[in-house]
């Protein structure tokens, strides 16, 4: 099994090795792999989506790279409402949000970043990127100009990344429990 992009893989003996040096586990972060096919979502997801579709004002759509500044601002607004309330998480300013989107720009696939809106105000997002490990695994740890070109060709022309990695998901607190996450996932399924 090849780990997802940005997820470490360490042989089993690493745990004991690090613990012998005095390191301790800080927290467990789990990543799940699931194959998604059209029509595979549970009936409850489709029911919640149907209720949303019957309610006026809700809109779900993927982004356009031509409008990345607005995407960054929508991301910031939802992030600050959904994530900045957690301890250890700071609010994000405009520059930081725009910097994040610019860093992601080369690998962004517009069909992998979705926003939810209510009366044209952003209320949720799901940001995914192609799993780069499927492509860069053959680079043997080297990332010079030639491998950068190979990566861009594999992502933009050959579409060799056949898995995606969900980076972050957020819904503003006032819309929790209303099925916004179901609407975003259903929109992704339709694409």
Regions found by a protein language model. Give the residues of each.
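A conserved beta-strand-loop-helix scaffold within acyl/acetyltransferase catalytic domains
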Residues: 59-171, 186
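Acyl-donor-binding surface of acyltransferase catalytic domains
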Residues: 1-62
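Hydrophobic helix-cap positions at the C-terminus of alpha-helices
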Residues: 52, 104-107, 191
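Flexible glycine/acidic-rich beta-alpha junction loops that bind and position SAM and/or redox cofactors
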Residues: 28, 34-35, 132-136, 175
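Acyl-donor binding region in acyl/amide transferases
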Residues: 1-23, 27, 140-191
């Amino acid at each position: 099994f090849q780990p997802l992009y940005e997820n470490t893989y360490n042989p089993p003996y690493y745990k004991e090795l690090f613990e012998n040096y005095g390191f301790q586990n800080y927290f467990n972060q789990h990543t799940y792999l699931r194959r998604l096919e059209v029509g595979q979502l549970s009936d409850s997801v489709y029911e919640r989506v149907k209720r949303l579709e019957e309610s006026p004002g809700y809109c779900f759509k993927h982004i356009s790279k031509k409008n990345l500044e607005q995407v960054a601002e929508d991301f910031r607004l939802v992030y600050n409402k959904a994530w900045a309330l957690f301890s250890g998480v700071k609010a994000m300013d405009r520059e930081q949000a725009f910097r994040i989107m610019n860093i992601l720009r080369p690998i962004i696939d517009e069909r992998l970043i979705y926003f939810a809106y209510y009366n044209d105000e952003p209320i949720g997002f799901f940001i995914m990127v192609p799993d780069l490990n499927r492509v860069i695994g053959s680079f043997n740890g080297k990332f010079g100009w030639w491998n950068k070109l190979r990566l861009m060709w594999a992502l933009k022309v050959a579409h060799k990344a056949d898995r995606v990695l969900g980076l972050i998901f957020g819904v503003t607190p006032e819309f929790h429990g209303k099925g916004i996450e179901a609407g975003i996932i259903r929109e992704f399924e339709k694409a």
